[in-house]
Amino acid sequence: MSRTAIIVEKVLPHGAEKIWRALTTQGMIAKWLMPNDFVPRVGHRFNFHTRPMGDWDGVVHCEVLACDPPRLLRYSWKGGSDADGSKVSRLDTDVTWTLTPVDGGTHVRMVHDGFMLPGNNIAYEAMSPGWGRVLDGIARAIAEAA
């Protein structure tokens, strides 16, 4: 098996503080990702909830691993199904957000790391384009909140 990551980055036309709020406020996160019980505190365990698919219950289990406002946020991202008994399709990954102020806004870099291929291939293929759309969703959520 090989380990791989999804990396998306974009300059958003907002300050780091506004983007940080979008990344760390439950209501804002629900607008661009999923309903959740997130709290920006290292060690906090939380869940994302979405529609179940196949053998997967629709719950992503997470824990805040690093939180350095308004620059860095990292959390574990675990879930998936091991209905086949092999555990190869279960996710045990991390998501890291890095915010860097630049002219005209903030450079946002998201790395979702730890996909073990080929076992996590279905999740990797589904999430790769999804994370790209998420950055636009964050920008929309910030604009709507203004």
Could you say what each language-model-derived stretch is?
Residues 3-9, 45, 59, 72, ...:
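Intrinsic-disorder/low-complexity, polar/charged segments enriched in Ser/Thr/Lys/Arg/Asp/Glu/Gln
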Residues 7-8, 27-59:
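Short beta-edge strand/loop motif at the mouth of beta-sheet-based domains
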Residues 10-16:
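A short beta-loop-alpha structural element at the N-terminal edge
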Residues 22-23, 67:
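Conserved catalytic core of Hanks-type protein kinase domains
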Residues 24-25, 136:
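Solvent-exposed alpha-helix faces
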Residues 34-40, 54-104, 113:
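Hydrophobic-ligand binding "helix-grip"
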Residues 114-146:
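A conserved amphipathic terminal alpha-helix motif
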